[in-house]
Amino acid sequence: MNYLFKDGRYMNEEGKIVATDLLVQDGKIAKVAENITADNAEVIDVNGKLIAPGLVDVHVHLREPGGEHKETIETGTLAAAKGGFTTICAMPNTRPVPDCREHMEDLQNRIKEKAHVNVLPYGAITVRQAGSEMTDFETLKELGAFAFTDDGVGVQDASMMLAAMKRAAKLNMAVVAHCEENTLINKGCVHEGKFSEKHGLNGIPSVCESVHIARDILLAEAADCHYHVCHVSTKGSVRVIRDAKRAGIKVTAEVTPHHLVLCEDDIPSADPNFKMNPPLRGKEDHAALIEGLLDGTIDMIATDHAPHTAEEKAQGIERAPFGITGFETAFPLLYTNLVKKGIITLEQLIQFLTEKPADTFGLEAGRLKEGRTADITIIDLEQEEEIDPTTFLSKGKNTPFAGWKCQGWPVMTIVGGKIAWQKESALV
């Protein structure tokens, strides 16, 4: 099916939002211009809505295989499509871990069979993510590994991390890291700060993250490796990454929507839906994340979509697993709380969710260019809705944002020229 989207707006190559039509033919973007006509295409009047590149998320947890009670490739990718994401990168903390040919082939077959959006799987750095034996990077790359990470745990052994970075560098691949120094975690369930003190909870100190990042940055410099830092959350981490970039070290970084919108002061009670790792930090950390995003220290936004069951989250803040679901709330949360408040521009938000992650990892995604695969998201910037977890397509309903009123909701998502999801009656 060919589609002609009429009367839309998009961000052009100069970074300006302008009026446009867009023609999709044979799964590709055939033309982006005003006043397009086509005889062999279904016309969809978007009535002034935003035509954006399909969103790109380099940090997601789909749980399959092994955690299908939390999420599946099918439910997770449907949720991604509803959130406007057309390319997502799946972390390897599944069971089994994609750490060898057999496991990666099985995962890729599942993706091919079930996924509603483009899914790029990470390969594990170490066997079973146990930190003691390196995986076969060459084989995992051959089978389509996006990059290498043990996300969910930090690689504690410096010699292992250095060896991994050297091998990844030879393959022109990135090492991606969840950064925690295990000796400083302190069995914490929240940030070590005012909230932990008030509620008598063990806290995770900020330095637990930043000291690990500092170590890895020096290792990346020694290995001449592209090193990407997951979900930055502290002022110290931002400072270390900024200094590394100024020194010419190949480091990039991401931040989550929840760390841009919330800090520990926003946690109303010991609610496990506010429990994520890294935890919500202090006000100064929150301000540093915004500053880092604006000055280029932090390169992109990634959701860290981490679904869990209601039963798991009901165990209380100390025992419940870390993580919140993120696909279906990301854009409206960021648009409402950053763009509408004048903190960043709409153009910047689009870049942080599309071309920045795509360019960082060399993906042919993130831009509406003629000849490229038609991965497109239509967004109604005027539509206001209340976040209602019962409507999520994800199995995970675990969100701290229930009841928040937000503007800027995706209404249609196109993947490879085909409609992957659309809001009923939104485009008529």
From Swiss-Prot:
Catalytic reaction annotation: (S)-dihydroorotate + H2O = N-carbamoyl-L-aspartate + H(+)
UniProt entry keywords in alphabetical sequence: Hydrolase, Metal-binding, Pyrimidine biosynthesis, Zinc
Top-rank taxon, per record: Bacteria
The record's free-text note on cofactor binding: Binds 2 Zn(2+) ions per subunit.
GO process annotations (BP): 'de novo' UMP biosynthetic process; purine nucleobase catabolic process
Binding-site residues, substrate: 61-63, 93, 277, 308, 322-323
GO cellular component term of the entry, any: cytoplasm
Binding site for Zn(2+) 2: 151, 178, 231
Cofactors (names): Zn(2+)
InterPro entries, per the entry: Amidohydro-rel (IPR006680), DHOase (IPR004722), DHOase/Allantoinase_Hydrolase (IPR050138), Dihydroorotase_CS (IPR002195), Metal-dep_hydrolase_composite (IPR011059), Metal_Hydrolase (IPR032466)
Residues at the catalytic site: 304
Binding site for Zn(2+) 1: 59, 61, 151, 304
Keyword Zinc: yes
Protein's UniProt keywords contain Hydrolase: yes
Family that this chain belongs to: Belongs to the metallo-dependent hydrolases superfamily. DHOase family. Class I DHOase subfamily.
Function: Catalyzes the reversible cyclization of carbamoyl aspartate to dihydroorotate.
Name recorded for this polypeptide: Dihydroorotase
Source species: Bacillus cereus (strain AH187)
Lineage: Bacteria, Bacillati, Bacillota, Bacilli, Bacillales
